[in-house]
Amino acid sequence: MESGCNIPVGIIPAGTMNDFASSIGIPKYMPDAARVIAGGTPRYVDIGAFNGRYFTYVAAFGVFTQVSYATDQQLKNTWGALAYMTAAVREALQKGELNQKYSITIECNGQTIKDDFIFGMVSNSLSVGGIKGLAGNDVQMNDGIFEGIFIKKPSSLIELQQTLNALIRKEFDAPYFYYFKSSDFKFYTDGSVPWTLDGEYGGAEKDICVKVVHDALRIMVDGDKAAGLSNLKAE
């Protein structure tokens, strides 16, 4: 990125979830992915910048940041978001994390909100943690916009269940969380908050600026299968 080199990038998905690769239609079978690299078409995609550090598709904090990697994929394939949320609640209860809160001020789209949160993420992917549609069904990987979901600290287990139900149904106007589409997110906290970037520990920070880097990379894709790139921009 810093060098300004514009050579197309090829992706061999070898991770646990491969959310980013699946969002742009890269096959999970490695030989097929290699064929896309050799014979595909380069297309521009957006990435994110987290206080100047680049990430591919998700920056997150809070109680649900590790559970997706421990949830059985077959269970998720069968039950989707329900499996993810059930595992998340179980893990959070076991660790006592639902008693933890992050007091954060968020600036986005000309708005300023301050609240107590148990989870938040800024993402650019058709799936997060292997769950399709978690950030909505109209995500585009190259529109200059990321999606942000921030879950308020529930006052009771009943409210927590209502929150999860609303999230599963994608009722993004529900009172339990905030949902934004933006190219720029700013976070201000009283104490350091640990974040994950693309599923890896990203450090603990107080003041955070997350920005979209539009059309940052050219990636080799199979144009017919790049679901998250319906508005493709050629090289």
Annotate each predicted stretch with a short phrase.
Residues 50, 70, 122-123, 149-152, ...:
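Short beta-strand-to-turn element immediately C-terminal to the catalytic PLP-Schiff-base lysine
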